[in-house]
From Swiss-Prot:
<keyword id="KW-0325">Glycoprotein</keyword>
<dbReference type="GO" id="GO:0048046">
    <property type="term" value="C:apoplast"/>
</dbReference>
<keyword id="KW-0964">Secreted</keyword>
<comment type="function">
    <text>Dirigent proteins impart stereoselectivity on the phenoxy radical-coupling reaction, yielding optically active lignans from two molecules of coniferyl alcohol in the biosynthesis of lignans, flavonolignans, and alkaloids and thus plays a central role in plant secondary metabolism.</text>
</comment>
<dbReference type="InterPro" id="IPR044859">
    <property type="entry name" value="Allene_oxi_cyc_Dirigent"/>
</dbReference>
<dbReference type="GO" id="GO:0009699">
    <property type="term" value="P:phenylpropanoid biosynthetic process"/>
</dbReference>
<dbReference type="InterPro" id="IPR004265">
    <property type="entry name" value="Dirigent"/>
</dbReference>
<dbReference type="Pfam" id="PF03018">
    <property type="entry name" value="Dirigent"/>
</dbReference>
<feature type="signal peptide">
    <location>
        <begin position="1"/>
        <end position="21"/>
    </location>
</feature>
<protein>
    <recommendedName>
        <fullName>Dirigent protein 3</fullName>
    </recommendedName>
</protein>
<comment type="similarity">
    <text>Belongs to the plant dirigent protein family.</text>
</comment>
<feature type="glycosylation site" description="N-linked (GlcNAc...) asparagine">
    <location>
        <position position="131"/>
    </location>
</feature>
<keyword id="KW-0732">Signal</keyword>
<comment type="subunit">
    <text>Homodimer.</text>
</comment>
<keyword id="KW-0052">Apoplast</keyword>
<feature type="glycosylation site" description="N-linked (GlcNAc...) asparagine">
    <location>
        <position position="96"/>
    </location>
</feature>
Length: 191
């Protein structure tokens, strides 16, 4: 009987040790075949041109200030301000042109001596072959520059594993309301 208890105890200890051996913190990661995620395909370069409509006025603004700028910088740089956006992306400059998606995210006044914004947004496409796909932009936007360049840091759907950049050019800016239309040329490498 004591031999049986000893054997059972040894087996329980062995099973417990085996179960715990996989919990050393290294079993959460593994190498997989690139082809399982569609990475065996040839990489493509896609150019998208959309117009981003930042509407801060009216009954249905698409851009809402969450936090105003620090008082010291309120008129010079907007430093410290936080604005959430759900801006229409259209095929042409007029806001009533065909909507192909939304720019959703935020911009933050991040510069003290100029109007320099930190842009963090997803361009979420709603039509055509890119319906349901997104690209993610995270970068600096010096609003007063004629052309601004921001990096594409990722994407989803058709733009999985995306990288690239966006060139932004202001097409319309209403000094009274603050409403703006920006042309965005997106150059995206993806599979």
């Amino acid at each position: 009987m004591s031999k049986l208890i000893l054997i059972l105890t040894a087996q329980i200890l062995l099973l417990t040790a085996t179960a715990l051996a996989g919990k050393n913190g290294e079993d959460f990661a593994r190498t997989i075949n690139r082809k399982h995620l569609g990475l065996g395909k040839k990489e493509k370069l896609t150019h998208l041109r959309v117009y981003w409509h930042d509407i801060v006025t009216g009954r249905n603004p698409s851009s809402i200030r969450i936090q105003g700028p620090v008082a010291k910088y309120s008129s010079s740089s907007y430093f410290g301000s936080i604005t959430m956006i759900d801006n229409a992306l259209t095929l042409d400059v007029p806001i009533n042109s065909t909507v192909v998606g939304q720019a959703q995210g935020m911009y933050v006044g991040a510069a003290q001596k100029e109007i320099g914004l930190l842009m963090a947004m997803n361009l979420a496409f709603k039509t055509g072959k890119y319906n349901g796909s997104t690209i993610t932009i995270l970068g600096r936007n010096t609003v007063m520059s004629k052309v601004r360049e921001m990096p594409v840091v990722g994407g989803s759907g058709m733009f999985r594993f995306a990288r690239g950049y966006v060139e932004a050019r202001t097409k319309l800016f209403d000094m009274k309301t603050g409403d703006a239309t920006v042309e965005s040329n997106c150059y995206i490498l993806h599979y």
